[in-house]
Amino acid sequence: MSSKMRQSVSLTDAVSKVQELWSPRVVAEVDDVYVKVARVHGQLAWHSHKNEDELFLVLRGRLRIELEHGAIELNEGDVFVVPKGVRHNPVADSECHILLIERKSTLHTGDAITEQTRSVAEQLRPL
């Protein structure tokens, strides 16, 4: 992924090419930030990112961000930022397409390593 985009990116097309659930793929870079798309269904894992905020934007469907003291329900077009250090668990009761914006240093599942954890190298694979 080049830091200088030479063409526009269709988020709809990009997310349709993602084969695995909970496997974000980088579609753009802005300074020290990756813009990613993902297909999600079910739940990921309770985790936190000690030093990074994480932005979720729902492109299609519904997403619930479970927090230790409640949950945030997101519909298409809704955005929510999970502040650094806050434990959270993304959940989609049916397939949902999301856009994530996070610093390049952000680990996929933060402080939790699971079979769903994807490395940055995996997220950078071409679609």
Regions flagged by a language model, labelled:
Residues 31, 59-60, 75-76, 94:
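A cytosolic small-molecule/anion-sensing beta-strand core signal
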Residues 1-36, 113-127:
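A short, N-terminal "cap"/entry segment at the start of jelly-roll beta-barrel domains
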Residues 68-85:
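Short acidic-glycine-tyrosine-enriched beta hairpin
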Residues 21-22, 49, 82-84:
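Residues that act as N-cap/strand-start positions at coil-to-secondary-structure junctions
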Residues 26-27, 38, 45-50, 66-67, ...:
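Short histidine-centered beta-strand/loop micro-motifs
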